[in-house]
Amino acid sequence: MSETDGQVGKVEVVSASTGQMGQRYLAAGSRVAMRLWDEQPESEGKPEAAREYETVGYVVSGRARLRAEDQALDLGPGDSWLVPAGVRHTYEILEAFTAVEATSPPAGEAGRDAPPA
């Protein structure tokens, strides 16, 4: 669903497409998009990568550690976070993790959401 046609819309999670890293693409407009990380399993952080988009997120359940350049933030239920565009970062999943993120510009367009090399 995209805002480009001037219509309001809805994306049901059961029909949302899934990205290469396990994210579910939710509602998206021309300037912002939402995605869901649902029950992501425990994992060590991947190599840090910088993205062209800004990310804000909210933890629904589970725990993760966000490493961004010289910072480490522990995230748990009810926490929210911000990763500015261009900041190198990674997530270490400490406990099965569910979170909702919004990205601007939309991460799922123009190959911006590809897994880090």
Where are these regions (language model features)?
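A short, N-terminal "cap"/entry segment at the start of jelly-roll beta-barrel domains
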Residues: M1-L36, Q40, K46-P47, P116-A117
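Short strand-coil-strand connectors
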Residues: S30, R67-Q71, L94
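Surface-exposed loop/turn positions
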Residues: S30, S43, D79, V87, ...
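Short, conserved beta-strand element in jelly-roll/cupin
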Residues: E39, R51-L66
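Structural motif
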Residues: R63-R65, A72, R88, T98
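Short acidic-glycine-tyrosine-enriched beta hairpin
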Residues: D70-A85
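Ligand-binding loop in jelly-roll beta-barrel domains
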Residues: A85-E109
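Short, charged, intrinsically disordered terminal tails
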Residues: G108-A117
